[in-house]
Amino acid sequence: MPPKKAAASSAKKGQKTRRREKKNVPHGAAHIKSTFNNTIVSITDPQGNVIAWASSGHVGFKGSRKSTPFAAQLAAENAARKAQEHGVKKVDVFVKGPGSGRETAIRSLQAAGLEVGAIADVTPQPHNGCRPPKRRRV
């Protein structure tokens, strides 16, 4: 019986691991999309290319806990930490959606060390477009 080979390293043989290059972007934009079910924070460069992102689900919350302000706070801190590795120091904030994590996410971006410039609400308003979902009866 031949001897067993030692376990291979975590990287597969012949496969290159892609190295993420560090961009140097001092000023960016933070897009906070806060829905009733989740909060997504994306930090972009001035052209709109995403540098860092995080969401309540990505941070580790599941189900109804994703929609809490605390989950939005952790998602914003996580995205801010990743963006600071790319040199982001100042952001303009664009908030979209009706969710509960809007204000908390903005506050935690400031607390994480990013300087917040302008804050704009870019929630899309329908000109009587799609029919909204029916009322819940609990």
UniProtKB/Swiss-Prot annotation:
Q: Which InterPro entries match?
A: Ribosomal_uS11, Ribosomal_uS11_bac-type, Ribosomal_uS11_CS, Ribosomal_uS11_sf
Question: Where in the sequence does UniProt note compositional bias of the Basic residues kind?
Answer: 13-22
Sorted alphabetically, the Gene Ontology BP terms of this entry are:
translation
Entry's SUPFAM superfamilies?
A: Translational machinery components
- The segments labelled Disordered in the record are 1-28
Could you tell me what this protein does?
Answer: Located on the platform of the 30S subunit, it bridges several disparate RNA helices of the 16S rRNA. Forms part of the Shine-Dalgarno cleft in the 70S ribosome.
Q: What keywords are annotated for this sequence in UniProt? A: Ribonucleoprotein, Ribosomal protein, RNA-binding, rRNA-binding
This protein's assembly is summarised as: Part of the 30S ribosomal subunit. Interacts with proteins S7 and S18. Binds to IF-3.
Gene name in the database record: rpsK
Mind telling me which Gene3D superfamilies this protein's record contains?
Ribosomal protein S11
* Pfam families cross-referenced by the UniProt entry: Ribosomal_S11 (PF00411)
Family note: Belongs to the universal ribosomal protein uS11 family.
Q: Which organism is it from?
A: Mycobacterium sp. (strain KMS)
Q: Name one GO molecular function term.
A: rRNA binding
Compositional bias of kind Low complexity: 1-12
What is the protein name given in its UniProt record?
Small ribosomal subunit protein uS11
The terms describing its cellular component in GO are: ribonucleoprotein complex; ribosome
